[in-house]
Amino acid sequence: MEHYLRSVHNSPTLSMISAARGLSPAEVAHEHLKERGIYGLAPPPPPGTTPTEYCHQMAFLASHASPYGELLVQSAAAGNTSHLHDYLTPMDVSRFSSPRVTPRLSRKRALSISPLSDASIDLQTMIRTSPNSLVAYINNSRSSSAASGSYGHLSAGAISPAFSFPIHKPCSLSAALSQQRSLSSSFGHTPLLHPSPTFASRQQGALTSANPAPPSNNSSAPDSVLNKVSSESAVSSTVNQVIHKRSKVKTEEEADSVRFPQPPDHLTDLKEDLDKDECKQEPEHIYETNCHWDGCSKEFDTQDQLVHHINNDHIHGEKKEFVCRWQDCSREQKPFKAQYMLVVHMRRHTGEKPHKCTFEGCFKAYSRLENLKTHLRSHTGEKPYVCDHEGCNKAFSNASDRAKHQNRTHSNEKPYICKVPGCTKRYTDPSSLRKHVKTVHGPEAHVTKKHRNDIIQKPSLPKENGDNEASAKLSGREHSDSVSRDQEHCLQTRTIKTEDNMMHQSSPGGQSSCSSEPSPYGNTNNIDSGVDVSLAWQGSLGDLFGLEETSPVVDSTVSSWQRSGRPATPETQRIHSAETGTAEEREIKDNERFLLIYEPNATCQNTRLPTISANGFDVIGVPSSVLINPRAIELSMNDVTMMNQLNERRDSTSSTLSSAYTSRRSSGISPYFSSRRSSETSQFGGRLNNSSSADSYDPISTDASRRSSEASQHSGLPNLLNLTPAQHYRLKAKYAAATGGPPPTPLPNMDRIGLRNKLSLMDGADFPLPPFRQLPVPRRCSDGGGNAGLTPMYPHEIPGNNSRRASDPVRRTAGIDDKPLPRFSRFHSMNSMNTLHPPSLSERRNGGLQHYTCSDGGLHRHVYSPRPPSISENVAMEAISCDADVPGGDDDLMLPDDVVQYIRSQNREAPEQNLQTEYSSPARNLQSNTKSFHNNTPEQPRAPGAYLSRNFPALAECLGQTANMQDNNMPVQWNEVSSGTVDVSDLPKQQFAAGNLAVVQQKQNFAQYQSFNQAPMQRAHNIMGQGQESVQRNISVNGQRFNYLQQRQQQMSQCQIVSSDFIPQQRYSQSQSMLSSRAMQEGQSQISPSCNNMVERPGVHTHAAPSNTLNHQRLAVHGAPTQGFANNFSVNQDGLHPPNAYTVQPQKNGLEPQQNTLGMSGQAFNHGMIQPRPPAAPHPPNRPRNIHPVHHPPYMRSPHPVSELSPGQQTAEATPKRTSENTDPTPKDNNLLYYSGQIHMYEPNGNFGSGIDCTVRQLPTMPSPGANQVTSTVDSQGLEHPPVIDFDAMMDDGDHSSLMSGTLSPGLLQSFSQTSSRLTTPRNSLTLPSIPAGINNMAIGDMSSMLTTLAEESKFLNLMS
């Protein structure tokens, strides 16, 4: 005792408690006792304890410098000495269970006040204030919580060994403790223990163990007892069978004693709860070593042997019949539904408690895992069950306590009516009712399911933990014929929770406080698991989860279902019978609810907590995650309204489900955390995966995350996702009002749907969107779910606002803000503009796998209605579109009509292009691949090195290295490959062609080129000569393409697909070549001044006469194609800036573009890299964007700035405006990309003769897929075609290394980044490592990367289309 007092005195918990209450420990204890009414109680000394002894004990306690000493003295004076002694005298109470005494009545009512209760110490405060104190407090109450079986409840029923004290006259103490236990139960199991829960709980535990609580130790009691025990069984399993047996005995005794003093129902309930809890405590461990199985009398030396014997010989031996044949088993051989239930049940007989508390110094063990879990809450202080009553912050470790609390504290409702004829008792929680029935009416009078149904059945034998669990699972047990058993099962279902109830008691705030108080969800159908709350309850998901975790899954499941039916608290379970009675009173109305409780499928009707209606949806089958978001469930339940609600919530609603899941990414990086969208998307968090580019791309990808969320919104759930975008849109429109959002703008996606139909018309076939999305294809497009319209733009979404999420394409304020651009449905994603057309199968297989950047492609260059479709709409449509396998529709869906037409023509031409690209050289192959890549051949990896690796291992190797390096170096978007962009590293085939599409590739290409340039580039230069012929041919073709391309650009400014035939040199310059061939062919002058950044390598000046001739443009170099761009890549098509046109701004590249734009000639780029500069802003549609094709023959060389280009123009725009000037229809060239990004070509040697700010401008109208679409900043319609650099020509011209030399300038990347809110425009976010100055002039290479990016974008567009 002294030891105990010391521990108590020194108990941080006590200190904390006193501190919490502003009382000295003594005052705390005193006040606590006083509050508990202990002082008002003057029970005789414990039986067998002489007053002298009792006083001696108290004196002993008082003699110690313990707050309890004073309390004891005071209490002794008050005549409560015996009880105080009981409280203060730590005894192995767990070994003593005693009937509750009258004091318990007053205490019981007081007990309703949990430590968390007002009168009691605020355990939450304690816990939150001082975990240590809480832990200490819990440790003190640990045994009680554990012993009491009310996990986390202070009065666990037994004092932990650490707190056990030598018992003066244990017998008398046992009696005293019995009384004490009653008192403690009354007091919340530890009146003093609130100050020092440990003591009380332990005493209680000791009392419990000493005097098995008749009801509390019911697990050993008859089934009726066991029902309580069953609920208690969880704990009861903890409780020794012997104790249970004792409990049985004591239960009856206690029933009498309790019965005798029974105060108001609440007190009685509390008393019963305490008893129950105590019983739950799993009193003294039964240690059976002899087998009493029917016909078996084997004896064993150890319990383990017995258990082994029973399990192997009896249980497993009767595999198909799960019947306990133990002699005198209260179950009366009622079969269990599952073997494990029988196994658990047998623990009642054997006393096995395999689940031991792992906390140091805590020796609690439980037969049921859920009881252990509940118990552990006493250590952790976890109280997942928070009172649902507004303004009440009390939390409970179990649902039953919460239910008690809620019903008792916040209402006078006693829904649990005793169904025993002639009994009018009503209780606030099922455990109390159960306890009442057991104690007052006897173990046979258990409230059964039928009782609850107002059918009083012969109380089935109490379920044990296993039984309870089984019951819980069985809740309406297999043997409905044995109604009592069924009832019992029902109770036991709750009984399972009853153990949980025990557990709930064990919560620090719980047992006495919590247990006394119904768990917060108790109002709801409290199941200890708290699952009760799941459907019916408005409680948090955490409750469900916590409850489930707390209680066995079965319990949680059952209880959750039960909860739906009614609160399943420990009491609920135990009281299931009682609950049947009391709850029936209210639940008679709610018998269905009980059915729900027992029948998971039944929806709870009368849960106190707002039930989450499942639209007939049985939550049971729903994943907890789904359950978490009832809305999602409802959605899955086809509640379109839920969709609307989710949409309304968009961010928060959806996020409930998906935020944690689907929006995990979205919340990750994006400045605005796609969490919003992901929330939206999350709404349907059921989505199997976030198709969002975020998922597809870099997990970090900001933009992807949000969109991915959006995509994910629809991804998992078939309901919305099943809807076609149009359907989704309709739903959206229907619920626009509900969502509070403006009526969904006819989705561009809808338009796209229409478009798709149109495209289908174009294609001649309209492919219905699959009811479910195909596997969500990682896509920016998915991110581009067209819900942006509903969703307010985020700052980052605001055009020109760079703060926008990378995933959110933002119109660049520069040009776009200046002029109203056709509003893309969503700047956040390509799809926002237009629902992404599902990529073609090949695209999905390839591009989709490669996370084709749909985001830009998704942007249809339509003027969209002011309100773009909501994210959900777009997402759903997008997801559907993107995922749907629409033979012709995929591309169509992704692209605007013009784009689709363009793509179609391109696709038709693609073979031609491919053939063209396939002239003879690997470069052609690369081009072909690039083309095919752009031709919606996602299949062709974009990884810059992959294709090269195929053709040029060295290049590929360099590229691969660079890609990896640069992907790492790249901004997330780049890694993510800029929402629309595919990560280059992932794309092996489209090396450079994709480079521009994915700036990442560019970076990779550059870095690769940097290393690659030096050798492979030179080699490429060598090849270049070879390739040049091809290039020339290709250029010819490219010229044709370019012409066609121009047409397409005009037609499909949105689709910037640059394909070019690449010789290996061109490979690294593939994109560049493509761009150069086409862009330059298309309009060398189209190269925006940003292109001026491309430095012509002093050496051969390739001046392509700014003739529209494809060859000239194609060469974009003034020399023969054979003139390689090698060292003299003059790309000064009209787009070239003056030497200092722009300072290359290092993006995330290692390269630092020179602050001054590289001089046209002479200015050597220090980094020897081409770093595309992002255009300062997208040019206004009217802004002169590009040098007219081949207006300025001098490309790189010509130092003259292209005055016609505005600086912004000079700056490559991630999304170049389409220049109507360059409208020369070129043979469809998927490879043809328009790189609007400004590329700063830095000569590896830094020798670029002229710093050319080459803004390879994709046709402004046709930003590379990532560019405009991602950027969403540019209205392609109104934009001029940016000068296109003919990288093929450049490549042909020679210095590939110069082309390749260096990553796109950070500025270019930056412009990309600016332009491309998403990775779609890899250029924006792509940080290209600078290419060593020593590397060959890679201006083209950089252009190539740019072109590659553009190509990728084009490909992406193609994919989207």
Curated annotation (Swiss-Prot):
Region (Disordered): 185-270, 434-527, 556-584, 647-720, 787-832, 906-946, 1134-1230
Comp. bias intervals (Pro residues): 1172-1183
UniProt biased composition (Low complexity): 506-522, 653-670
GO biological process, one term: smoothened signaling pathway
InterPro entries registered for this protein in UniProt: GLI-like, Znf-C2H2_ZIC1-5/GLI1-3-like, Znf_C2H2_sf, Znf_C2H2_type
Biased segments, Basic and acidic residues type: 475-502, 573-584, 805-821
Major subcellular site: nucleus
UniProt keyword annotations, A-Z: DNA-binding, Metal-binding, Nucleus, Repeat, Transcription, Transcription regulation, Zinc, Zinc-finger
Pfam families named in the record: zf-C2H2 (PF00096), zf-C2H2_15 (PF23561)
Top-rank taxon, per record: Eukaryota
Residue ranges, compositional bias (Polar residues): 198-208, 227-241, 672-695, 710-720, 913-939, 1142-1164
GO annotations of cellular component type: nucleus
Localisation per UniProt entry: Nucleus
Zinc finger region(s), C2H2-type: 289-314, 322-349, 355-379, 385-410, 416-441
GO molecular function: DNA-binding transcription factor activity, RNA polymerase II-specific; RNA polymerase II cis-regulatory region sequence-specific DNA binding; zinc ion binding
Transmembrane regions listed in the UniProt entry: none
Keyword Zinc recorded: yes
Family the UniProt entry places it in: Belongs to the GLI C2H2-type zinc-finger protein family.
Function: Has an essential role in the early embryonic patterning of mesoderm and neuroectoderm.
Name this polypeptide is given: Zinc finger protein GLI4
The organism of origin for this protein: Xenopus laevis
Source lineage: Eukaryota, Metazoa, Chordata, Craniata, Vertebrata
